[in-house]
Amino acid sequence: MTGQDGEPRERVDVFLTGLAFLDIVFTGLDSPPVPGTEIWAKGLGSGPGGIANFAVALQRLGLTTSLAAAFGADLPGDLCRQVLAEVGVDLSRSRRFEDWTTPVTVAVPYPGDRALITYGDPPPVSQDDLVGQPPASRAALVHLAPDSGAWIERARAAGSLVFADVGWDPSQQWVPDELEHLRSCHAFLPNADEAMGYTRTSTPAAALSRLADLVPLAVVTCGADGAIAVDGTTGESASAPGLAVDVVDTTGAGDVFGAGLTAATLAGWPLAERLRFAVLTSALSLRRPGGAMAAPGWDEIAAWWTAVRHTDDTALRRDYAFLDDVIPLRRSDER
């Protein structure tokens, strides 16, 4: 181990920990690769992935972030750390390990589907060892792991709203015990397959109902169909339909959704507006390759809203009218 980067910030908007990857995305394929042949992609994107998607997306929405993640002493790790530092993510609680390889994912989207290939070893230290005492923060965001418990409870006790998600279970066993750390969490943000798998239900709505018994804010993302949520702290329930965009790459879209929801929750918006905003940020990220690096900032959100206001889609203008009050303030903050 070669240590940490810089002096820790005393307080941030959002603290994050989990597994970081270097994502490499090939786009513009007309069909999936066929063994024994070579095909050329029309587009290429790369950048930090995994938990880093959340950090970059939050920074672009104007929130300060601190990330505790392991990086190898290798080119993928150095590239990830460089990009994260350039966008303003605090890496003082991240560590660089000499004898560990930074995970790498290659994403190959093509019409109607995509394929992912990942290389990586288990993290060299536990989340609790990596985090130690989490910094003061308004929110904390975690990829749930068996060793997440202690630091999550410390963050919650210190006043942070803890937002959690899970990764895909390649065994598809979906062991419910893996959700035990949700007792210390404010929100849980699985996709529909994950939610139904862990709750042993057959519809996203049924899964949401079960998850609402476990956390104050339960959210299920449903891909192109949008998202549904229940907030037990306010008694609100809401759904938000997906938005029609020209999809280039879906890598990291769920993470960008989580960042949008976190930012909107910290802003104190009603649940329906939080959900719509998260769907919007996720949808805008689909238009470019590269996961984290495709996450929108306020200028891109403002450009989308300007275009919508000049259409005859009255339902869309009504649903997103709240942006009229939000965008001028946020863009002013950026300057």
Protein language model regions, located:
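Conserved phosphate-binding/catalytic loop of the ribokinase/pfkB sugar-kinase fold
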Residues: 96, 105-146
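Conserved phosphate-binding/catalytic region of the ribokinase-like
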Residues: 1-15, 204-335
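A short, aliphatic-rich alpha-helical micro-motif
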Residues: 9, 134-136, 182-183, 212
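Glycine/charged-rich beta-loop-alpha catalytic/anionic-binding loops adjacent to active sites
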Residues: 32-42, 88-90, 234-245
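Conserved phosphate/ATP/ADP-binding segment of small-molecule kinases
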Residues: 156-161, 167-239
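Hydrophobic anchor at the start of a short beta-strand
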Residues: 14, 64-65, 91, 162, ...
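A glycine-rich helix N-cap at a beta->alpha junction
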Residues: 83-100
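Glycine-rich phosphate/adenosyl-contacting loop at the front of the ribokinase-like
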Residues: 1-70, 75-78, 316-335
